[in-house]
Swiss-Prot record:
It comes from Trichodesmium erythraeum (strain IMS101). It comes from the Bacteria. It is found in: Cellular thylakoid membrane. PROSITE patterns: ATPASE_C (PS00605). CDD domains: ATP-synt_Fo_c_ATPH. The chain crosses the membrane at residues 3-23, 57-77. The record marks E61 as: Reversibly protonated during proton transport. NCBIfam families: ATP_synt_c, PRK07354.1. This is ATP synthase subunit c. Its main location: membrane.
C-alpha cells in the first residue's frame, strides 16, 4: 500500500469518528436537557417524554455508529489500497 494512501486513510478514519461523534453528542445533550425540563414542567407526562427521548437518542447514536463503521472500513478493508 502506498504510504500516502495509508496516511490519508488514517486521517480520514480519525475525522469520521471525531466529526461523527460531535453532532450527535451535542444533539443528545440538548435532547436530554429538554426532556428533563419537560418532565419538570409536566411530571405526569414522564413516561411519554422518556419513551420519545430514548427513541431519539437511539437514532442519534446510530449516526456515531455509522462514523465508526466508515472508519473501520477505511482502516481494515480499505477500498483505495
Amino acid at each position: 500500500m502506498d504510504p500516502l494512501i495509508a496516511a490519508a486513510s488514517v486521517v480520514a478514519a480519525a475525522l469520521a469518528v471525531g466529526l461523527g461523534a460531535i453532532g450527535p453528542g451535542i444533539g443528545q445533550g440538548n435532547a436530554a436537557g429538554q426532556a428533563v425540563e419537560g418532565i419538570a414542567r409536566q411530571p405526569e407526562a414522564e413516561g411519554k417524554i422518556r419513551g420519545t427521548l430514548l427513541l431519539s437518542l437511539a437514532f442519534m447514536e446510530a449516526l456515531t455508529i455509522y462514523g465508526l463503521v466508515v472508519s473501520l472500513v477505511l482502516l481494515f478493508a480499505n477500498p483505495f489500497a
